Amino acid sequence: MEDLTRYEIQDSLFPTDNELEIPTLRLDMQPKSCAIPFVLFGEARRSFKMQGQGTLCFYTDDYRFQTVYEHPEKIVAMQPANIVEPNFSLYDETPIAFGMQQIYKKRWIGRAMQMKGIRVFVDLCCSPKFYKLNLLGVPRGYQSFCTRGYNHQVEHLAFELEIARMVADGRDLLFVCYGGGQPCKDFCRENGLIYVTPVVEVRNRSLRYDKMKEAVAFFGQEISMTALNPKLNDLPRLEEMMGERVEDFSDKHSIAVSERKEATNG
């Protein structure tokens, strides 16, 4: 097992711009593009290294990444260029006091990662109840945001985009939507955003294609589906679909392979 002590981060009180002392993110350490590959925490093996490339996100069940607040070195050890702040869940039923702790944790992790040279997308995915509080520690002029899309809640995506525009204060926006299916992808296309298809959706689609290509029983005989329909040979392969997971609908060419840089402490 890898020794993570060399990646350890000292417990710190970071600079803040609010009475609740939630850390303030650095404007100079926000992503300038959506670095690929776009990786979901816990999806790859523990020893996986991004080697200063790509973007790491946390749009999965909380239990899969709960330990990253106590052990942020787990993130540093993966060596991403960018991260999306950990999405500690905030629901309508979440008490405000508990929700503030969740917001503190993700913003602390974000600031700590910036200190380590990792650029940070602000996570906007939360219950509307927390939309305003979720901006504590996000300075005006911040331009890089990400959210989780849901196909039955496109109106939430639209509102979160308006929040991002308000914070960016007229500056060019880098906005990424992770998942949500065709309704969210269409919204991204209409509004010039970046859409990321989750790996699980790509794999499920590949499995459906594989089943279409399988031989089928037909009057007691095994007949190839591709013999019945040669176009099935042209269905995309898994590798091709993986390569098309991140789609940039903006006119800014906002997808890049890598943009890691070292940062000074602060």
PLM segments and residue spans:
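Non-catalytic, usually N-terminal nucleic-acid engagement modules in DNA/RNA processing proteins
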Residues: 4-77, 84, 94, 185-187, ...
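Non-transmembrane, interaction-prone segments in cytosolic or luminal domains
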Residues: 27-51, 91-105, 111-114, 120, ...
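A sequence-composition feature that detects small, non-aromatic residues
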Residues: 35, 44, 77, 81, ...
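Eukaryote-skewed repeat-based solenoidal scaffolds used as protein-protein interaction platforms
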Residues: 49, 65-209
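C-terminal accessory extensions appended to soluble enzyme cores
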Residues: 1-30, 190-266
